[in-house]
Amino acid sequence: MSRYRGPRFKKIRRLGVLPGLTSKRPRSRSDLQTQLRFGKRSQYRIRLEEKQKLRFHYGLTERQLLKYVHIAGKAKGSTGQVLLQLLEMRLDNILFRLGMASTIPGARQLVNHRHILVNGRIVDIPSYRCKPLDIITTKDKERSKALIQNYLVSSPRGELPNHLTIDSLQYKGFVNQIIDSKWIGLKINELLVVEYYSRQT
């Protein structure tokens, strides 16, 4: 299944706020209105929607997300927590969380177009897994710096998660540590995502 490129507002109307996909927010709707519009949700549908939230927020294909679930399942600790950590430490997401891109798709474009360096080397793989002590910078070219500056100025600045630091003047971000679960950038029940995939096998 390919990466979603359709109307973004349609997705947030169904799934709720997805800051990685778009900065737009759906109009508030009561739980009763939602239930009347979409009908009573089955347990399967609830699990499916949580999985879709994760997929669309981080901009993944179904195959990519399944791969991350398998990796998380083999790691020590809670599969759901490890899954979220893996997704949060992707380079495209780190750029987004630093405010160097307004959305994760925007961050992915910066990486694909070779504007981004990690530890002084160009990295053009959005899924690159960042590690503690990584230093993320832009190419020393006017166009690259202009793109990042535009994002830093125009992006709404939320509270920076404690595993990251940004030096806006130097167009430089620092990864201090692995992300703590309370700083995950999406309201999600990751256990339902794990359950969804465990029931598919």
Swiss-Prot record:
Compartments (UniProt record): Plastid, Chloroplast
GO molecular function terms noted in the UniProt entry: rRNA binding; structural constituent of ribosome
Keyword Flavoprotein in annotation: no
Annotated keywords: Chloroplast, Plastid, Ribonucleoprotein, Ribosomal protein, RNA-binding, rRNA-binding
Transmembrane segments: none
Residues annotated as domain S4 RNA-binding: 89-150
Position of the signal peptide: none
Disulfide pairings: none
Pfam family, one: S4
UniProt xrefs under PROSITE patterns: RIBOSOMAL_S4, S4
Any one GO CC term of the record: small ribosomal subunit
Protein's GO biological process: ribosomal small subunit biogenesis; translation
Protein family membership: Belongs to the universal ribosomal protein uS4 family.
SUBUNIT field: Part of the 30S ribosomal subunit. Contacts protein S5. The interaction surface between S4 and S5 is involved in control of translational fidelity.
Function: One of the primary rRNA binding proteins, it binds directly to 16S rRNA where it nucleates assembly of the body of the 30S subunit. With S5 and S12 plays an important role in translational accuracy.
Name of the protein: Small ribosomal subunit protein uS4c
